[in-house]
């Protein structure tokens, strides 16, 4: 675990999550600003959120994995794909990034267009319980799409993961906006709520729904549909951040072998 945290790659990944979430929240919320000359449409907002996540997954995914969402990060932890410490750092970076993105937009947007900064709320007489189920379903399909399209074990063509993920986010918004404004991402809900200081009694919906939905998708995908072949010892090592794949051990062995040969000469 100490080795993982002390690496430059780790801190690059954490910063990438901060930056990606900042940009995602800025563009996503920005598409929902209520300009007097042209109010936003459901389609406009849905496409903007999808384009934002797809662009960022393509640009910064290779650095951090492109989670950009605490629900996805926690689901990958449950799915034994990342370490506990990485999950903690990622979630913290995502939440701070979301606040920063919402704060920048608040500062830039004129008062007559700012509105409530697209703070998530229950719409059309949706009860908190139903809203939670809606968020669960929306995030479940998003998480399944992410896990499947980025699974390195797949041998069949998967196309562009960034495009698939972007379309999944767009799909969720096309349905979810009518119920909850569509969160699917606790950071997306948390950022503007902090900046606007508008935490409704139903704010928990935008944490519980997405997190439970993503975790259920992780259990289904990583333990039932496509279970890992790792031993219990290796699974524990993944959570602790000390796991090294066999190919890494082979690389290390070759490097040591070359070093010994050079020293011998």
From Swiss-Prot:
Reactions the enzyme catalyzes: H2O(in) = H2O(out)
Cytoplasmic compartment spans: 1-12, 61-65, 75-87, 148-158, 225-265
Residues spanned by motif NPA 2: 185-187
TM segment ranges: 13-33, 40-60, 88-108, 127-147, 159-179, 204-224
UniProt keyword terms in alphabetical order: Cell membrane, Cytoplasmic vesicle, Glycoprotein, Membrane, Repeat, Transmembrane, Transmembrane helix, Transport
Keyword Iron listed: no
UniProt family annotation: Belongs to the MIP/aquaporin (TC 1.A.8) family.
Domain comment (free text): Aquaporins contain two tandem repeats each containing three membrane-spanning domains and a pore-forming loop with the signature motif Asn-Pro-Ala (NPA).
Function: Aquaporins form homotetrameric transmembrane channels, with each monomer independently mediating water transport across the plasma membrane along its osmotic gradient. Plays an important role in fluid secretion in salivary glands. Required for TRPV4 activation by hypotonicity. Together with TRPV4, controls regulatory volume decrease in salivary epithelial cells. Seems to play a redundant role in water transport in the eye, lung and in sweat glands.
Name this polypeptide is given: Aquaporin-5
The species this protein was found in: Rattus norvegicus (Rat)
